[in-house]
UniProtKB/Swiss-Prot annotation:
Source organism superkingdom: Bacteria
Organism of this sequence: Staphylococcus aureus (strain MSSA476)
Keyword Ubl conjugation assigned: no
Transmembrane segments: 18-38, 63-83, 100-120, 122-142
GO cellular component term of the entry, any: plasma membrane
The protein's name: Multidrug resistance efflux pump SepA
Entry annotated with the keyword Lipid biosynthesis: no
Subcellular location: Cell membrane
InterPro entries in UniProt: SepA
Membrane topology category: Multi-pass membrane protein
Family of this protein: Belongs to the multidrug resistance efflux pump SepA family.
Record's function text: Involved in multidrug efflux.
């Protein structure tokens, strides 16, 4: 009975470790590709003298510094989008939460909050506000293009 219990416990532990390994490996691959993409973007910004990145320590310090910049920025933009969607659902008749005005307000609030909450605190990343506006605007347009607004894409009427 104890041997059976330990065998079952070992099987559960092994399964958990395999799932954890797959999760960590896929996350590492995603972060690697994200890092290469951001490295390319930073090289473009440096080449055209649109940005300056002066934090150069060890690889892990750089990964933590620049990675936290991206992660915190993502959470700010994510929070603004969900808050704006919540307002749109709560106030469907309000003209500010319909059409292009809604998207312009969402984009403006997200960009402004990102700049003042995240960007100004990272003193080793020097990018002008208008460059940040263009980058976030491009990402916002891509989000609208590839993730269109709909209640249910599989619902055919």
């Amino acid at each position: 009975m104890i041997v059976n219990y330990l065998k079952h416990k070992f099987y559960n532990l092994l399964t958990t470790m395999v799932v954890l390994f797959i999760f960590v490996l896929s996350g590492a691959i995603f972060l690697t590709f994200l890092g290469f993409g951001l490295y390319g973007l930073s090289r473009i910004l440096i080449y055209f003298r649109l940005g300056d990145f002066t934090y150069n320590r060890s690889m892990y310090d750089n990964l933590l510094y620049y990675g936290s910049y991206i992660i915190f920025g993502y959470f700010i933009i994510f929070a603004v989008e969900h808050l704006m969607d919540y307002f749109r659902k709560m106030l469907p008749e309000n003209a500010y939460f319909r059409g292009a005005t809604f998207h312009l307000i969402s984009y403006t609030v997200a960009t402004t909050l990102f700049y003042f909450i995240i960007h100004l605190n990272y003193v080793y990343i020097n990018i002008d506000f208008w460059v940040i506006m263009v980058i976030i605007g491009f990402l916002y347009v891509c989000k609208l293009q590839f993730y269109p607004e709909s209640k249910n894409l599989n619902n055919r009427k």
